[in-house]
Amino acid sequence: MKKLKVVHYINNFFAGVGGEEKANIPPEMREGAVGPGMALAAALGDEAEVVATVICGDSYYGENMDSARKEILEMIKDAQPDAFVAGPAFNAGRYGVACGSIAKAVEEDLGIPSVTGMYVENPGVDMYRKDIQIIETGNSAADLRNSMPKLAKLVMKKAKGELVGPPEVEGYHMMGIRTNFFHEKRGSERAIDMLVNKLNGEKFETEYPMPVFDRVPPNPAVKDMSKVKVAIVTSGGIVPHDNPDRIESSSATRYGIYDITGMDSMSADDFTSIHGGYDRAFVVKDPNLVVPLDVMRDLEREGVIGELANYFVSTTGTGTSVGNAKGFGESFSKKLIEDGVGAVILTSTUGTCTRCGATMVKEIERAGIPVVHLATVVPISLTIGANRIVPAIGIPHPLGDPALDAKGDKKLRRELVMRGLKALQTEVDEQTVFEG
């Protein structure tokens, strides 16, 4: 029997190409299995083989989603596979978005059975769970030996046209799809059994789980920005050099509040980035790329804003749990209110950093303060529920372009901040992306 052909998608990290400094590499295709593709090949056994591996940098895909997806689809189409596997991405946000986006497109546009895998808190799960089967994984690559056989088993079922079972059987995240089938007990009996178990305090499982929506209505627009105190919050990991609060480089459990009284710019002598989710080279040289103090001071002097808070709030968003991010936002929002802050600009960098940032945005909004989210990976911000969003420039430099000279870079940063201020002064009744 002829072996089925499988194409595998991985990012630059898993391909062994490099770390964050190589996260901007464009798509390429290699023959055979690469990196975790070896585990996929082993799990497929004698029925299928990995004929090619597509590799792309996470930042490149995140910043060029439409064109990168189109290029990758052409590569996959040329390989003529019978099935496609992306990842697994575990809890890597940018990687998860890429895996979900590509797997969805391969199945819908090319008609090739596809699967991917992610940790439950990966933002890619909520973005693509209704479109594609996403195998539940652990939060790191340590789970590869457990998750890859599940991906292989499911994609082979799909490739051979076999019936795919429910999430609890196959191990994928719930898709919100209901299927009719014959049960050995009629509905009334099952309902009575469920009620009896509930009354007795015993375990029971609903047959119709209700979706949970956590959306916060947008606050009214700022009427007169020239009379309002504005604060800067970031999930981009900017801290003083000694990192006094010992904020972790990933999966943060705390945040910090740092004084900027009398400062006209974020100096590399005073601040650095401890963030583990993007290439910090640009930001270490110029922290204004994440915390736009230089531009905000100019706007304060010009009377565009009433006042800039004499501190900024910072944490590391990469890998940080939704629960922790929510707790951070609830906590520091109380201080913002006590200090009379009337508007917030929140900046984010990578994928899970954007998830963390958008989660904090919702808590700031819930506290009654208008807030705008400046982030490059806009789809994640939308999925999590930010209401006012301004697309940023790039994952490792959201508020500027290091390729420009200092004057041009600052001009670009000012344009972004002004767009953010415009968003804060615009009435919205639904999620709105302010493109410019």
UniProtKB/Swiss-Prot annotation:
EC code: 1.21.4.3
Please give the coiled-coil regions recorded for this protein. none
GO function terms (MF aspect): glycine reductase activity; sarcosine reductase activity
Tell me the active site.
350
- The answer to keyword Oxidoreductase applying to this record is yes
Spell out the GO cellular component terms annotated for this protein, sorted alphabetically and separated by semicolons.
glycine reductase complex
Cross-referenced InterPro entries: Gly_red_sel_B (IPR010186), Sarcosine_GrdF (IPR054959), Various_sel_PB (IPR010187)
Keywords tagged on the record: Oxidoreductase, Selenocysteine
Q: Which reaction does it catalyse?
A: acetyl phosphate + methylamine + [thioredoxin]-disulfide + H2O = sarcosine + [thioredoxin]-dithiol + phosphate + H(+)
Provide the top EC class: oxidoreductase
Q: Which family does it belong to?
A: Belongs to the GrdB/GrdF/GrdH family.
Q: What NCBIfam families does its record include?
A: gly_red_sel_B, sarcosine_GrdF, various_sel_PB
Function, in words: In the first step of sarcosine reductase, the substrate is bound to component PB via a Schiff base intermediate. Then the PB-activated substrate is nucleophilically attacked by the selenol anion of component PA to transform it to a carboxymethylated selenoether and the respective amine. By action of component PC, acetyl phosphate is formed, leaving component PA in its oxidized state. Finally component PA becomes reduced by the thioredoxin system to start a new catalytic cycle of reductive deamination.
The record's note on quaternary structure and interaction partners says: Heterotetramer of two alpha and two beta subunits. Component of the sarcosine reductase complex, together with components A and C. PB is substrate specific.
Full protein name:
Sarcosine reductase complex component B subunit beta
